[in-house]
Design a protein with these regions (language model features):
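Gly/Ala-rich beta-loop-alpha elbow adjacent to hydrolase catalytic centers
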Residues: 128-136
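Active-site glycine-rich loops that stabilize anionic/oxyanionic intermediates
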Residues: 71-75, 176-177
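Active-site-adjacent alpha-helix of alpha/beta-hydrolase-fold enzymes
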Residues: 174-228
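Short beta-strand/loop motif that positions the catalytic acidic residue
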Residues: 166, 172-174
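Short beta-strand element of the alpha/beta-hydrolase
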Residues: 64-72
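Conserved alpha/beta-hydrolase
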Residues: 84-104
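N-terminal membrane-anchoring alpha-helices
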Residues: 1-45
Length: 247
C-alpha cells in the first residue's frame, strides 16, 4: 500500500469516527418529560418499567386490547405518560418500548417484545408519533396479521411502507400547526393509507404537543395548551378504539 493511499484511508477513518461520535452525542440529547407532566403523572409509582418497556396497565380490570406506541425521534418514552395513562385507565394496556439510540427506525420490530408484556392479550394496535409512526407502519407492512389497527400522532405512511392494501383500520391525528408533519405531507401521502382511515385535525395543535417534552426545532408554535391537545388525543383515541372494539 503506497503512502498516499494509506493517508487517504486514515483520513477517511478519522472522519468516520468523528461522524459516528457526533451522531451518538446527537442521539443522547433527548426530549425529556416536562414539569407539567411530572405533576400530572407519578411515573415512578404509576408506570411499570420492565425489560426496556414502559407499561401502563388498567386498574381493577382486564385489558380489552393492547396498544404499542413508538416514540418520536429522541423523545423519552415517559414524555407520553399523560395520554398513555388515561388510555390505560379506560381499559387498554399501553406499552412504550425504549428504542435503540432513541430512534424508532432502529427498533422497528420492538413490537414483538412489547407483546410479551401481556401474553394473554390477543389483539394489538400499533401506534407512533412522527418518525415513530413511520417505524410503526414499516412493522405493520411486514406483520399485518399481528395487529388489529394503527394510530398515527403527527405522522404518515410513505410509498416505502404502502399500506393501501391493508385490511386493518388507521386513525390519523394531526395538528393544524404541525411544522414537521405538515398537512401537505399528510394529504400528499393519503393514497398509501388503508381504505379504512379516519382523519382528525387538532385545531391549533402542533407536533411536539403529542407528547409533553417542550418545544421542538422546526415545529410551529401551538395555539392551544399542551394539556388541551393531549386531552383531545385521549378523547379521539378512546372513541376510535371503543368503536373498533365493537366490531
Amino acid at each position: 500500500m503506497n503512502k498516499k493511499l494509506k493517508l487517504v484511508l486514515i483520513i477517511l477513518l478519522i472522519l468516520l469516527v468523528v461522524y459516528a461520535g457526533g451522531f451518538f452525542i446527537w442521539t443522547q440529547k433527548t426530549f425529556k418529560p416536562t414539569a407539567q407532566l411530572n405533576q400530572l403523572v407519578d411515573v415512578k409509582n404509576e408506570v411499570q418499567h420492565k425489560d426496556g418497556m414502559y407499561i401502563f396497565k388498567p386498574k381493577n380490570m382486564e385489558p380489552k386490547d393492547g396498544v404499542i406506541f413508538y416514540p418520536g425521534a429522541k423523545v423519552e418514552p415517559t414524555a407520553y405518560s399523560y395520554w398513555a395513562k388515561k388510555v390505560a385507565d379506560a381499559g387498554y394496556l399501553v406499552v412504550i418500548p425504549e428504542m435503540p439510540l432513541k430512534l424508532a427506525l432502529l427498533g422497528k420490530n420492538k413490537a414483538e417484545e412489547a407483546m410479551k408484556a401481556d401474553p394473554d392479550i390477543k389483539e394489538w394496535y400499533i401506534a407512533g408519533h412522527s418518525l415513530g409512526g413511520s417505524a410503526a407502519s414499516a412493522y405493520a407492512l411486514k406483520h399485518p396479521h399481528k395487529i388489529k389497527g394503527m394510530i398515527f400522532l403527527g405522522s404518515y405512511t410513505t410509498e416505502g411502507s404502502n399500506l393501501s392494501k391493508a385490511h386493518f383500520p388507521l386513525l390519523s391525528i394531526y395538528g393544524e400547526r404541525d411544522g414537521l408533519t405538515t398537512k401537505a405531507k399528510i394529504n400528499g401521502n393519503k393514497s398509501f393509507n388503508p381504505a379504512d382511515t379516519t382523519y382528525y385535525e387538532i385545531k391549533g395543535g402542533n407536533n411536539a404537543q403529542f407528547g409533553m417534552y417542550g418545544p421542538q426545532a422546526g415545529d410551529k408554535k401551538a395555539r392551544i395548551s399542551n394539556k388541551k391537545q393531549q386531552d383531545q388525543v385521549i378523547k379521539e383515541i378512546l372513541f376510535w378504539l371503543n368503536k373498533e372494539n365493537q366490531h
